[in-house]
């Protein structure tokens, strides 16, 4: 099961403490996955579709707790591509439907369809958190923290996407909106922001798993950087030692090491004897002890002599 699916299953078990929070969450779920159906007799029903059984159960429970009305649940199995079940939670036409639509913010007081989210649904911060939870359950996903950090919510309405982005902004989340074919995507890319969003909507187990994976990933990346740095330094050291030996052998085989001043001859002989030694180790072998810069200076002088030989200047 993906990290996103595990997160949604956790959120499907989170119950809003107040009726106002449960109403806000249900309203968001209907905004994301629901539709109004009006029959020829002007009878109104609400259809909410999801592929997640836990979310379908939550929608059913929220409607029962809030309104105590008749609900229909239909299950259809897909036959093409993914063979997941599709769950239809339906509020059929019945007495008091107008009041239900009004409380959900789907119509105004005069019975006209309401496109925007009614402000009175989200007066409290707890209701705003519940609404965002419903939004994520209805159309959200989050990447595994082991990969690229990314959390998104997809909706077909640009105005609703902008509203979600603005609502996230009230919690100091720097969400952005982009277009993906016919869909509008509200997304977060920063790991800290994703962690905060999971905290806001009540996905605390997912948050802890995300943090653990993020820490492991950060440590692994840091170790890799250190290893790469050490490898690069080692390669430089090896390349330098090979160059130094080439210079020394050239001098030895042409004019002879005895032609060099004593300090240079001493370091040349040590380099031949200890080809894998570091500059510090070479310096420690000389009496009095020589610093790394001192050893490097002598080897550089040897290099200059070798270059003169290569260019024909004896």
Swiss-Prot record:
Q: In its UniProt record, which GO terms are filed under biological process?
A: cell division; regulation of sporulation
Question: Which domain of life does this protein belong to?
Answer: Bacteria
Family (UniProt): Belongs to the WhiA family.
In alphabetical order, the GO MF annotations are: DNA binding; endonuclease activity
What PROSITE patterns does UniProt report for this protein, alphabetically?
A: INTEIN_ENDONUCLEASE
Q: Which UniProt keywords apply?
A: Cell cycle, Cell division, DNA-binding
Which residues constitute the signal peptide according to the record? none
Q: Which PANTHER family match?
A: CELL DIVISION PROTEIN WHIA-RELATED
Pfam family, any one: HTH_WhiA
Sum up the protein's function in the record's words. Involved in cell division and chromosome segregation.
Q: Which residues bind DNA?
A: 278-311
Q: What is this protein called?
A: Probable cell division protein WhiA
């Amino acid at each position: 099961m993906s990290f996103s699916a595990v997160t949604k299953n956790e959120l499907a078990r989170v119950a809003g403490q107040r009726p106002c929070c449960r109403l806000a969450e249900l309203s968001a779920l209907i905004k994301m996955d629901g539709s109004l159906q009006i029959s020829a007799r002007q009878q109104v029903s609400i259809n909410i579709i999801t592929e997640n059984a836990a979310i379908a159960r939550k929608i059913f429970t929220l409607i029962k707790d809030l309104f105590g009305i008749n609900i229909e649940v239909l299950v259809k199995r897909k036959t093409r591509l993914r063979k997941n079940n599709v769950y239809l939670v339906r509020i059929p036409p019945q007495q008091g439907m107008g009041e239900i639509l009004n409380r959900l913010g789907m119509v105004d007081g005069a019975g006209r369809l309401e496109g925007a989210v009614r402000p009175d649904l989200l007066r409290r911060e707890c209701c705003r958190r519940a609404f965002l939870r419903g939004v994520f359950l209805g159309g959200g996903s989050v990447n595994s923290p082991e990969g690229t950090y990314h959390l998104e919510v997809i909706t077909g309405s640009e105005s609703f996407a902008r509203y979600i982005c603005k609502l996230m902004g009230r919690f100091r989340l720097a969400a952005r909106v982009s277009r993906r074919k016919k869909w509008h995507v509200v997304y977060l890319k920063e790991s800290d922001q994703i962690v905060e969003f999971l905290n806001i909507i009540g996905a605390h187990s997912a948050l802890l798993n995300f943090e653990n994976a993020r820490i492991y990933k950060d440590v692994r990346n840091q170790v890799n950087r250190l290893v790469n740095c050490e490898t690069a330094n080692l390669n430089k050291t090896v390349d330098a030692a090979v160059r130094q030996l080439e210079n020394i052998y050239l001098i030895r085989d042409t004019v002879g090491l005895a032609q060099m001043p004593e300090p240079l001859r001493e370091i040349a002989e040590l380099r031949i004897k200890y080809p894998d030694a570091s500059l510090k180790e070479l310096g420690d072998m000389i009496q009095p002890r020589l610093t790394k810069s001192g050893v490097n200076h002598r080897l550089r002088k040897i290099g200059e002599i070798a270059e003169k030989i290569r260019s024909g200047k004896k």
